[in-house]
């Protein structure tokens, strides 16, 4: 008789000492909170590129700063753009920053953000300040954080959209970005929010997708969880709920807390994404845990596409 292997949900939740023993990035985060590295940036610059410990280079990821590849002593700076929407003034500002600090070159990313390259280390404070002056941020553009929030590129102007989600995206970005309670996640965490009936933002491949829908005349969202690509691709699963527009932050917090508070997803970086939580518990189990986290039941709903107007 062959013994059945227990599912992830049946295994004992590992203690923190085991997490720290097996996962060097979790140790690094415990030793020094990554967002705090910004206060040490002048000291790191004074020490020089070659003298910076690799652990501090990793912590700089939390500020959207990473080695250029190959490692040539300059840095890539990633900028968050909520929903991929830039004003003309912001675009001109980024162009000026690129001209002055990044060899007049910039990249548009697949997650609707921006990247600069070849930024010299001693110029990083000036670049970060210029980005902030443009009303943008690099905080959490990399690292174990909520990354840039993607959406339909024609939010607010498409005649087919069910409703304008730009205010929701701005609210979610304000809550999560730079929030210390959500800057020590098991792994990177990707949201997409849209009310595009064509789902051009690919909700199937995101960690959490808020999919615009209308129920009984009320605008809101269906919720999909656990999508992702890489070496272990998954299509996100529909939780079978309807969330009113004004509860968007609440549902995103609750789902994220269920995941980040379970040490099972901190032992191995390769098994840390929220898709493995969905593998272990299924969408019904995830919904139950989210309802427990919220302290209330969620309204039934569906992620079925609603035809455009």
What residues fall within each predicted segment?
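Peripheral terminal and linker regions in Fe-S/redox and tRNA-modifying enzymes
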Residues: 1-309
């Amino acid at each position: 008789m062959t013994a059945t292997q227990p599912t992830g949900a049946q295994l004992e939740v590992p203690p923190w000492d085991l997490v720290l023993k097996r996962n060097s990035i979790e140790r690094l985060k415990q030793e020094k909170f990554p967002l705090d590295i910004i206060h040490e940036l002048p000291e790191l610059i004074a020490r020089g590129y070659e003298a910076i410990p690799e652990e501090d280079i990793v912590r700089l990821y939390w500020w959207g700063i990473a080695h250029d590849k190959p490692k040539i002593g300059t840095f890539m700076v990633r900028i968050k753009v909520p929903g991929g929407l830039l004003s003309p003034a912001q675009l001109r500002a980024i162009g000026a920053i690129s001209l002055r600090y990044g060899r007049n070159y910039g990249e548009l990313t697949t997650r609707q953000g921006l990247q600069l390259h070849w930024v010299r280390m001693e110029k990083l404070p000036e670049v970060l300040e210029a980005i902030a002056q443009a009303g943008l941020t690099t905080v959490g553009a990399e690292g174990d954080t909520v990354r840039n929030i993607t959406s339909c590129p024609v939010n607010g102007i498409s005649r087919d959209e069910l409703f304008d989600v730009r205010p929701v995206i701005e609210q979610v970005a304000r809550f999560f970005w730079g929030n210390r309670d959500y800057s020590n996640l098991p792994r990177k965490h990707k949201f997409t929010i849209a009310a595009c009936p064509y789902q051009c933002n690919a909700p199937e491949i995101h960690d959490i997708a808020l999919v615009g829908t209308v129920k009984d005349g009320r605008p809101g969202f269906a919720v999909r969880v656990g999508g992702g690509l890489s070496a272990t691709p998954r299509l996100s699963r529909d939780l079978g709920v309807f969330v009113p527009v004004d509860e968007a932050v609440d549902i995103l917090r609750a789902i994220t807390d269920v995941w980040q508070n379970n040490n099972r997803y901190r032992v191995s970086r390769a098994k840390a994404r929220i898709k493995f939580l969905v593998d272990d518990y299924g969408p019904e189990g995830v919904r139950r845990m989210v309802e427990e986290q919220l302290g209330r039941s969620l309204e039934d709903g569906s992620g079925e596409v609603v035809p455009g107007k």
